[in-house]
Amino acid sequence: VAIAINKDVDILFVIDNSGSMAEEQALLSKNFAAFISVLEDPEVLANYRIGITTTDSGNPRCPSAQYTPEGGNLVLSSCLDRVDQGEFTFNSDDFSKTCTDFCTKRNADLTVRGTATGVDPNEVPRKWIERIEKVSNINGVADNTEAFQCYGPQGVAGCGFESHLESMYLALAGAASPKSKNNYGFLRDAAILSIVVITDEVDCSYNPATKEIFTTNKVFWNDPAVDTAPTSSLCWFAGVECTGGPGTYSECHSQNWDKDRKVTTDPAAAVLQPVSKYIDFVKSIEEKKQEIDENQRVLISLITGVPVGYDTFDKEIPYEDRPADDEEQINFGIGPGCILGDVNAPTATARPPVREREFAEAFLDDPKTERNLYSICQDSYAAALESIATKIRDQIVPACMPSCVRDKDRSTPVLDPNCRLIETNIKGEEKDIPQCTEVNGAWTAGNGANVCFATLIDKTGKETLSKIDNISDYCNMEGFNLEFVLVRSAPAAAGTTISANCELSDNRTLDCPNL
C-alpha cells in the first residue's frame, strides 16, 4: 500500500522589493515568528525549506546594466550587507531601519551549513533556509525566525514594474533545472508546496516579444500625447479589463491585450504573459505531487492590496477610479484596493489585485467559500502569517496505515504489527527501511542508516511506557489502528516513494472496531 509519510514543506516567498515596500518588509520580519511557530510546533515539526526571491525579473524601464534583477533566483544574504550596497535607499531616502530594526548579523556572522538535496548528495551550502528533523542549516542565530529577519528583507531598490508571477515561475522552474545554481534541488517531489507573495502593486509580467509597450509603443500609457515615460498604470491597462464604470466598476478580470490594445486569443501576442501560463505551470507541479499523495494541494497565499477582512468575507475588493488628475490614478491607473490610516492622509495604500488574484483563486476548491488573499494595509501581519502557516499545517496529515492491521499478540493491550516499509527509487529499485529505536525519547536510526520508520500504536497515550508512540487524534478518529513516522537524516532521492506491507487483520471488529 502506498503511504504518504510527509512532513516536508517547501515554501517560496516572493517579496516585492520596489520603492514603496519598506514598511511592509519590516512588518514581515516583525511578525515572522507567528509563521515559524506553527511549523515548529511540537505537534507539527514540519521539515521545511524557505526560499526567498523578489518580484524583480527585469523590465525595459529598469536597465540591467545598472543592477542585476533576481529573475527568480533564490537569494540568501544578510540585509545588513545589502544596506551597505544601497539596496535600502529609494529616491535618496534611507530605509535601512527595515533591516536594522530586526537584524544584527552580517553574512560574516552567519554560516550556512552544507546539506544534501534529492538531486545532489553532496553536503554544500544552499540558498535557502531549512529545518529538517529539528536541525536548522543556519548557524549563528538563535532560530530561523532570526535567520529570516536577516535574509527576508529585500530592500527597496528593485524594479517598480513588478513581475510577481514571472518571478515565481522562474524560481520554481529553476528548482528543476541543473542550470540554476541557486535553485536546483529546492523542490522535493513529495513535499507540500506553499507559495507566498507579498506586494502592494499589480503584476506586470510582460512578454519580451512586445517589450516596446514600455518604450516606443505608448498605447497603454496613461496619457500617450504628453507622457515621456510610462507609470505603473501601464501594468493595469495592459493586463486588466473591468465592467461597469468609469468610476466604480462592478468587477475586474485579467485580459490578454495585443500591442494594438485589442483582445487577443493568441498567447504569444499578449503584451503581458497570460495568467493561464502560470496556473498551468503550477498545476503541473501539483499533479506530479498528487501522483504520490492524491490529497496534496499546492497552497497559494498573497498579502496584497485587499481590504482588512477580505479573507474572512467581511469586505470586498473595491475597483474604483480616482479623479483623472489624481496622482494615484496617474501612477497606477486605478484607486487603492486598501488604505492604511486616515483615508485623507493614508500611511500606505496598495493596488487591488486582479491577475495575481485569479492565479491564487485557481488553487482553491471553491473561491465562494474560502479565500487566500490577506490585506497588506494593516499594522500587523501576525494573523495573516499564522493563517497561511495553519493551512500548511493542515496539509501535514498523519501517515495512518489505510487498512486494519492484524495484531500478532492479542494477549497485550497494544497492537503488535507485522509490517515492512519499502523505499522505491525512481528506477523501481526497492530497499527495506529499518525500524527506528527509541533513544532518550526520540526515534533514532541505527547502524549508520539515514532513514528509519517507527510504528505508533498507543491509542490512549497510556497503553505503553513510551511518550512518543501515541497514535494521532486524526488516525484514531478515522478508526485506523496503526500510524507510521519516518525519520530521515538526509533527504530522499528525487522520485522516491514509500509503501507499506503489513499483515492485515482477519477480525476487523476486534482489531479496528471504529473503522
Residue ranges and their predicted role:
Residues 1-515:
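Divalent cation-coordinating acidic motifs and surrounding scaffolds
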